[in-house]
Amino acid sequence: MNLINYTKRYFESKILIFLFLAIYLLFGIFIFKDYGISFDENINRFNGFVSLKYVFEKLGVNIDLSLFVNNLPNLSDYADRAYGVVFDLPMAALEVILNLTDPQEVYLFKHLVNFLVFFLSSICFYFLLNHLFKNNIISLIGLLFLISSPRIFAESFYNPKDIILMSSFIFAIFFNIKFLQEKSNKYIILGSLFSALTTDIRVIGIYLPVLTLFFLFFDGDNKGIKTKFIKSFKYLISFAIFFILFWPWMWDGNIYKLIISFKEFKNYPWEGEVLYFGNFLKAKFLPWHYFFVWFFITTPIIFFLIIILGLFRSFSIFIQNLINIEKINHNNLWKNKNEMILIFILFIFLIPVASIIIFNSTLYSGWRQLYFLYPPLIILGLY
């Protein structure tokens, strides 16, 4: 009887999740036409066509792109060549394939695809939460945190950079955690693939594979150092292949271009001003607390409180382990596999925030450049 009841509850919970996701998908498809064009969309579209022109030239494809966009420069001469086009390039190709020449059709199509990418990442986020917590209710709550945040929900339709980055980051976190736990070739490929895609969208994403390999080596399991070197080598080779493959600007193998992209991200050369606490401030001279304030005022208060409590608890566990490191097996920073993943997620959040504060990176339009940190914050809040 217990087995029957368990099986019944299991299928009921799966049906509930399926219905919830189906309703969410239909709702998004129903309202995607209600959103206008955001500031960056036209720029990103142009970026995609510049790279598409370069790809066509390399492949010997003769298609007149002036039917879609005029005055396309060569990629080598383009001012924004250092920005990844993982999303923009396929979207430009789809415009050509579908022969979308009407501007309204173009941007409505982009909004629909933008939402669908976020929807797929939402499904992945649910599976990630269920993998970590083994609880359908907690996983559903975490999913609600993600998709019902007003700013995230709205921008999931018209933000082709930050939302796409966050979506790719969710997949990358999931598969890198699976790689750390199982260390199989399948997850080497999937983890390196989505890490490369994330890095190709914004170069800051490169810290995730570095962090993953750091945790691989410092995990005091029964795997020998030779095995870990082999796994790391496979991961790095796969990452390098995917990284170059999905970023046409990198096809010539010039590693210096990666440094150029880093410099662009570290201090984006935008001379605009930002209204902050009643004063107009240069975006490149914003105070260190800019991100934290914007996160607070744009996140539902109950979400914010849960995330802060989880962040405090996670940081406390890490500090306690650091103090008592000599008492832990193999001198690890974690006592068990669950704590390893918790501290891994904590560092996923801490590293980019610390980098932005230290390098005084240019921020504007709220905290959208750091949206990719929202999913790991939700995970920390639920722990």
Where do the model's predicted regions map?
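Transmembrane signal-anchor helices characteristic of membrane glycosylation enzymes that use polyprenol
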Residues: 13-41, 49-59, 63, 67-74, ...
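Transmembrane-helix signature of polytopic, lipid-linked glycan biosynthesis machinery
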Residues: 28-33, 152-153, 157, 197-199, ...
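Short acidic/glycine- and proline-prone juxtamembrane loop motifs at membrane-interface regions
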Residues: 38, 151, 157-164
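Transmembrane-lumen/periplasm boundary regions of multi-pass, lipid-linked membrane glycan transferases
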Residues: 52-57, 80-89, 98-102, 197-199, ...
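Transmembrane-helix motifs of polytopic, lipid-linked glycan transferases
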Residues: 108, 112-133, 171-175, 316-319, ...
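Specific aromatic-rich, kink-prone transmembrane helix
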Residues: 124-127, 164-181, 190-195, 349, ...
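Short helix- or helix-capping micro-motifs
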Residues: 142-147, 174, 195, 199
